Amino acid sequence: MAPVAADSVLSTTDRRLVAALQWDGRLTAERAAKVLDLSPATVRRRLHALTADGTVRVVISPVARPRNGGSAGALFLRIRVLRGKLDTIVAALAAREDIPFIDVTTTGDEIFAVARTEPGSRDPLVFRQLPSTQAVTSLESATILHVFRLTSEWRHDVLRPAERAALSPAEPDPGPLAAGSPGPYGVDTDPLEQSLLDALTPDARLSAAALAARTGHPETTVRRRLAQLTLQGRLVTQVLVDPRRIGLPIEAKLLLHVAPDHLAAAGQALADHPAVHGAFATSGLSNLHAAAYFPDLAALYAFLSRDLVGLGITHVETALVGRAAKRTPPLGPVPPSPAVTRRRRPASAGQGKG
């Protein structure tokens, strides 16, 4: 990953605000000020500065953990290409809607990607299109079998235990499921809930008033449903920020061989590690995949030589990410949303015009 000038790393206050938003994406300035021992004016000013230029975005998580513990079925792809053909292959992959994440390693000829697919299906990308491309020299695919840690669940480790406890949400109350079509988290949604989630997807910090204006629903109804979604743990937000801006310029992909009787414990240990932002049990020779952020190479070495000891890991392959070629949603300012016109209610009987 390219070096970042020291002055581009966010201040301690800003990094603490980023971490607070990871715990509660809709955190108010007043509550953040109380928990972090800052003035509300400072919090409002810094949050505006961070979000106005796209340094930080809070979105509805595109990959959330369904209630049945799923999120399995997606494919990890490891693609090696001819030198000089990397950008062409990356561009072709990035154009596909079923590939939300693409990373290019520092070797300059290797791509890691995630492809959404149906479990057990013979995805044409893997079985026909990529293998027939002359620029591709090798292709490995592994199916996600179990999720230990999602990126939306990762928290930047800069808050004190008491602050984390104050910001941690209460244990979700499942409550009754809404009748409707499958929602983004593997549960059903009704039209009201789906319209709110759609409006919040690019900017999860929209106020209830703004949501009411965009969706055409009464503000009291919006507030009530938001509270219900939060209580049920279904309003899953994710903070988008370049990890280099929070002092973590090193990202590593880890492909691990773990003895079967240690797989569950090793996966959970990785999920609990503050550096790890993704951990999955997979098919293939490397049956545990992880992704982690580090402040420097010394920290990565300490992780490999100390933190992985005793987990039943028999082999580790480490790849450094040189460039995040695609993220869904992308980093940057919130895209403009089309205006939603509120439907006019028909005049009731006996109501005059004008």
What are these regions (language model features)?
Residues 1-354:
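A compositional/biophysical signature of low hydrophobicity enriched in polar/charged and small residues
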